[in-house]
Amino acid sequence: MEQSNIDLEGALRALCQRARTAARALAPLDRAQKDRALRAIAERLRAEAGEGKRSAVLAANAEDVAAARAAGVSEALVDRLVLDEARLAAIAGAVLEIAAASDPVGQVVGMERRPNGLLVGQVRVPLGVIAMIYESRPNVTVDAAVLCLKSGNAAILRGGKEAARSNAALGELISDALRSVGLPADAVQMVPSLDREATRILLGLTGMIDLAIPRGGEGLIRFVAENARVPVIQHYKGVNHLYADAGCDLEMACRLVENGKLQRPGVCNALECLLVHEDVAAPLLGRVAALSERGLELRGDAATCALVPSARKAAEDDYGREFLAPILAVRVVRSLDEAIEHIGRYGSMHTEVICTPRYDHAQRFLREVDASCVLVNASSRFNDGGELGLGAEIGISTTKLHAYGPMGLASLTTLKWIAYGEGQTR
């Protein structure tokens, strides 16, 4: 190993050791102590939002945004990067929502008396040290930090180079807030290097990292999966479908397409593919085609192109793509069976939607479609921690162990067996 890599590994091991020490200090804290830290973070975020151009966070973010645009980064990714007064205030509000949420740590699950008199059950405890590896979105820095803190975990954060200045400013804000309430600043640390080698080394530190959570594009997820020697929960891409069933409410279906695809095309719960039953293809696709006035581009199969002359012929890989742009793949299908088969082949186990008036079709779709969130007659945009009642989320897991779907506070804990006895022996 080169000397520079030895030095980097040593620095990362020292960082992880500080995190483990901080995690031991966090684990026994009561809710009031943790909430005090979260409120201190929210207060500083609100103060930054009120500073406008004098805000250190917004100034750092403006530099990141300018650099991203100069580098030719797409506007969808720039939108994920941008912070302004309103977004900072919204992040502060989300922190306060987490502070107001119940604390999962210490919750007792399923106590029962055994025949030998032992009282046994399980209690929720923190995981320990969580490494979060993510791209572009600086709000993830705050979300990950406060969710880890509230659940009693130490956080090691490695953001993308596009948001390096923003993340550094937010990291300093969080550290200052922790110190102000007497908690260890090492409870939330930023990886000091943006070199991919630092991420590879971090992912190999078994016994020091309890869980790694990658959140970003396909390349990042693949890199983490190939290099991790620590447990990983993946936040994979969102190749999300809407199936418009025979007899569906055409106005509703079009509304779900518009909201799912065009509200924020660059997010992971945006709609990427529309499957239309042949019985409603002509009237529904006529309505959807009108959304071209809002910049929507359709890429369809032969049946779609015959009904919508302005649609482009879809390539095979369009059906498995996360466009993150106002582009929608479309396919006309003959049955619910065909729709479910298509989703099984091209979906990413993220979010799937059916628009149908039929209860039996809805129930079958819910049972047979494998995704972290399946919705009936509702927008894909609802697969979100806040919308599902979790508050902010650390990610949307598309793996099944140990969490599936939006990961809130409870997903950042594990269950420990406990037993009360009166001297029983086996």
Swiss-Prot record:
- What InterPro entries does the annotation carry? Ald_DH/histidinol_DH (IPR016161), Ald_DH_C (IPR016163), Ald_DH_N (IPR016162), Aldehyde_DH_dom (IPR015590), G-glutamylP_reductase_CS (IPR020593), Glu-5-SA_DH (IPR012134), GPR_dom (IPR000965)
Q: Which Pfam families match?
A: Aldedh (PF00171)
Question: In what pathway does it function?
Answer: Amino-acid biosynthesis; L-proline biosynthesis; L-glutamate 5-semialdehyde from L-glutamate: step 2/2
Gene Ontology cellular-component terms listed? cytoplasm
Where does the protein end up? Cytoplasm
Record's keyword annotation contains NADP: yes
Reactions catalysed according to its record: L-glutamate 5-semialdehyde + phosphate + NADP(+) = L-glutamyl 5-phosphate + NADPH + H(+)
Question: Family, per the entry?
Answer: Belongs to the gamma-glutamyl phosphate reductase family.
- Alphabetized PANTHER family for the sequence: DELTA-1-PYRROLINE-5-CARBOXYLATE SYNTHASE, GLUTAMATE SEMIALDEHYDE DEHYDROGENASE
Name of protein = Gamma-glutamyl phosphate reductase
Q: What is the lineage of its organism?
A: Bacteria, Pseudomonadati, Myxococcota, Polyangia, Polyangiales
